[in-house]
UniProtKB/Swiss-Prot annotation:
Domain of life according to the entry: Bacteria
Protein name from the UniProt record: Protein FasE
An annotated GO BP: cell wall organization
Gene Ontology CC terms: outer membrane-bounded periplasmic space
InterPro entries in the record: Ig-like_fold, PapD-like_sf, Pili_assmbl_chaperone_N
Alphabetical list of SUPFAM superfamilies matching this protein: PapD-like
Length: 132
């Protein structure tokens, strides 16, 4: 039993890194919620969300808001390409008379075709963030 444990430990130390040496790094939002702030004289309200791509390939980022019975919050850019090892800042502008803050922002990351192998399925990654 002692020899089996030693052999297993040597195997893990020598070859264990190969199982985690190539993880897929995908983009992610830096915050879990978006806080709307007033700028300047208080007339313009804006929220900011930073997106980071630590991976080696570019991704497509699509963003929109959901909720508040038809009131639309503007998100700029709504569709953008985030390059490898870079960041992107999304700006959120609510309606001026919007008192209801029960909105959600959805950020969808669409992977490039270069990551897909012929027998694999690629699935977009979506985050749903609270706007407060």
């Amino acid at each position: 039993m002692k020899y089996l444990f030693t052999i297993l430990l040597i195997f893990i130390c020598k070859y264990g890194y190969t199982f985690v040496s190539n993880p897929l790094l995908y983009p992610f939002p830096n915050d879990t919620k978006i806080i709307i702030h007033s700028e300047g004289n208080g007339k313009i309200k804006k929220g900011i969300l930073k997106i980071t791509n630590p991976g080696e390939s570019p991704w497509i980022v699509q963003s929109w808001t959901e909720g508040s019975e038809g009131k639309k919050t503007a998100v700029y850019p709504a569709l953008a390409r985030i390059e490898a090892k870079s960041s992107l800042v999304l700006k959120i502008y609510p309606q001026p008379n919007d008192k209801d803050k029960s909105e959600w922002m959805v950020v969808l990351f669409i992977p490039p075709d270069s990551l897909r192998k012929p027998s694999e399925l690629t699935i977009p990654i979506a985050y749903r963030l609270k706007i407060i």
